[in-house]
Amino acid sequence: MDRASAKSKIVSYFKQQLSLGNDPSRRPQIQMGFLRELFQQEISALPAWQKDAALSVAREIVHEFMNIGALYPGQRGQVHGSDFYPWITITEYGKEIFANEDWLPYDPEGYLKALTEKVPEIDDVTRAYIGESVAAFNRRHLLSATITLGVASENLMLILIEAYTNWLKDPRKTKFQKRSKDRWIATQYREFKQEFTMDAKSLPKELQSDWEIYLDGIFNFVRLNRNDAGHPTGKELSAKVVYANLQIFADYARYIFDLKKYLQSP
């Protein structure tokens, strides 16, 4: 049984349970035993020695949701001994997760898989930091999620600036290197933007129309949030902002590598 499809099926089940909760005449009651019924068709097709292993994968997924605070053992509002495990209840945070249409930021494994499929050339450093960011977001460690997201974004920008530097011809290349080499990322980006603006109009149409959105808009927004998180500003971070940044990151990375490919083309 494929883990990704199993997780998707479990999420769909919890979504269905949430919809039942909207009916005042019904009270969702979930037991761990729902897994056997949910995967009855898949399990029945397996040899006997594989059935327990398949159910174990499903149980692991449920416990992962418990670990991030989306579920808790027991029934809501009950405190009697018989009302705890194997009963499970969707938490308020879980309701937020399962009700969301874009599920990927709440699924670290699925998020990285989708990112790699969309941007197969993504480098290991960027992938490592964005993976940390998604994992931290799911634990509600918003400071860590914001900082690691910012590092991933910065690394992509450094990759682009390097490709652009190699694309430039002298004397522009030498002058640009003197202004940007070994500087803070804010300085490097400022010099890059100033220089790149002169070349943006010659980009292919599909790259030309969005460069300010992806480079000036998304990169700067992520960088400023990272600065707020990385310094003792006391500013409260928004989970919705981190979620939105994680949503757009794959498109941002795709644009960076498309632009890099253009700059490296003969």
Provide a role label for each language-model segment:
Residues 71-85, 205-266:
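Charge-enriched, short contiguous segments at helix-coil
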Residues 130-162:
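Short, hydrophobic, well-ordered secondary-structure elements
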Residues 21-50:
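Short acidic, hydrophobic short linear motifs in intrinsically disordered regions
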Residues 46-56, 117-121, 192-223:
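Short, mixed-charge amphipathic alpha-helical segments
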Residues 41, 163-212:
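Short, charged amphipathic alpha-helical segments flanked by flexible coils
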Residues 2, 83-143, 251, 262, ...:
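Charged alpha-helical initiation segments
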Residues 1-32:
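Short alpha-helical segments that sit at the start of domains
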Residues 50-68:
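Short amphipathic alpha-helical interaction segments
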